[in-house]
Swiss-Prot record:
UniProt keyword Signal present: yes
Impact when changing V381 to A/W/S/R/Q/P/N/M/K/H/G/F/E/D/C: Impairs the interaction with ATG8CL
Name this polypeptide is given: RxLR effector protein 54
Localisation per UniProt entry: Secreted; Host nucleus; Host cytoplasm
Entry note about domains: The RxLR-dEER motif acts to carry the protein into the host cell cytoplasm through binding to cell surface phosphatidylinositol-3-phosphate. The C-terminal ATG8 interacting motif (AIM) is necessary and sufficient to bind ATG8CL and localize to host autophagosomes.
Region (WY-domain 1): 97-150
Family: Belongs to the RxLR effector family.
Organism whose genome encodes this protein: Phytophthora infestans (strain T30-4)
Residues covered by region (WY-domain 3): 199-247
GO cellular component: extracellular region; host cell cytoplasm; host cell nucleus
Highest taxon listed in the record's lineage: Eukaryota
Length: 381
């Protein structure tokens, strides 16, 4: 078969390098940034097993039937296979190392880095930021692809969110710093660091750019459940604060912000955790409290989850009382009663799980009466 013929050519190409003393195919790669840097500069070819496996995955790729989640392995059609077949024949007759030959095949085939990411299954087995040879080769392809097609053809944000699927923001920060100090990779490393620096805030403020537009421009929806960990989200929160200070009474408010979060994360628990996290930001604390109360009033299912989040954060009954703003007179007595009952239940749970000496029933009632004298609108049950 044509596929088997190409595979034999790939293995033949790798065999030449094996004779020169390659490491065993099962050699472990140390998960260190030093290892990554050395691989980026190391002219040695890949192991036979790695080349054969990577090439096999490459040859099975079909750009028409591609899953954006990284499950990109479908059989190719005759035209794609013939194109790669010809390229592989040319590589066999060259004096390039197996690693260089493989990279040249990818470059000449004009495969997109996002597609190759799926072909190599980097999304499945994680693009660990170490000396993984497939990942190193992918970085080299990205560099060449951007040089030939411009950075916007595969932008810094494209790279960031693709790698964020399998790595933490801290790991990515270290990767880009390493690339900036790696010969041949300094340009892409510097570009990535600049894109994550937050230099855009001043210009966006000058233009009074609507926060939703900024959110979408930064593609924060792509961060998913890692939204809170991404530097761009922290920068966006800073921008929103400054936007509010500059544009008092701006249309963009708490509910618009919550809508963005709900479009980014589908699970209510993740949204509640994110909203409560906003309380750690002094400029966002009051907005977070409003959002928590809004969620409690509009979603019965949020009550238990919210209480669990409070418990995990070890919020005291006094602090939860302030979050619920029970000392304030509300427009609807029924809402007040719901919030009061929620607070009383939380106080009991806090006493059971956190501090058995905190707030007896009598103390809770005394605290409440002191904070808000009872009137006829209230019914404690």
């Amino acid at each position: 078969m044509r596929f088997q013929s190409i595979m034999m050519l790939t293995i033949t190409c790798a065999g030449t390098c094996l004779a020169e003393g390659l490491a065993p195919s099962d050699q472990a790669y140390r998960p260190t940034m030093t290892g990554l840097k050395s691989r980026l500069n190391d002219p040695r070819p890949l192991s036979t097993a790695t080349i054969a496996t990577s090439s096999e995955r490459f040859l099975r790729f079909d750009t028409v039937a591609r899953d954006t989640a990284g499950n990109d392995e479908e059989r190719v059609g005759p035209s794609w296979l013939a194109k790669v077949d010809g390229l592989m024949h040319k590589m066999v007759t060259s004096s390039l190392s197996a690693e260089e030959a493989q990279l040249k095949v990818w470059i000449q085939s004009q495969i997109h880095p996002r597609e190759l990411f799926g072909v190599l299954s980097l999304g499945k087995r994680a693009a660990k930021l170490d000396d993984n040879p497939d990942f190193v080769q992918w970085l080299r392809l990205v560099k060449d692809f951007r040089a030939n097609n411009g950075n916007q053809a595969f932008s810094d944000l494209d790279i960031y969110y693709l790698l964020l699927k399998t790595n933490s923001p801290e790991q990515l920060k270290l990767l880009f710093e390493t690339l900036r100090h790696t010969p041949g990779m300094t340009k892409i490393g510097a570009s990535m660091e600049k894109s994550l620096s937050g230099n855009w805030i001043r210009k966006a403020l000058e233009q009074d750019t609507y926060p939703t537009i900024v959110y979408n421009t930064l593609r924060l929806k792509d961060a998913g459940t890692k939204l809170d960990d991404t530097p761009m989200f922290r920068q966006w929160l800073e921008y929103v604060e400054k936007y509010w200070n500059k544009n008092a009474g701006a249309f963009f408010g708490d509910t618009q912000m919550l809508t963005l979060f709900q479009k980014t994360m589908t699970e209510e628990e993740d949204i509640i955790k994110l909203v409560h996290m906003l309380r750690n930001n002094p400029g966002m604390k009051s907005h977070a409290d409003k959002l928590e109360r809004y969620l409690l009033l509009t979603s019965e299912s949020s009550h238990k989850t919210m209480a669990d989040v409070w418990l995990k954060a070890r919020e005291t009954p006094e602090e939860v009382f302030r979050i619920l703003r029970l000392a304030e007179k509300q427009t609807a007595a029924a809402d007040d009663n719901r919030m009061l009952n929620l607070w009383l239940r939380y106080t009991q749970t806090y006493r059971d799980k956190i501090d058995k000496n905190a707030f007896s029933d009598a103390e809770a009632l005394q605290f409440f009466r002191k904070a808000k004298p009872l009137d006829f609108d209230w019914e404690i049950v």
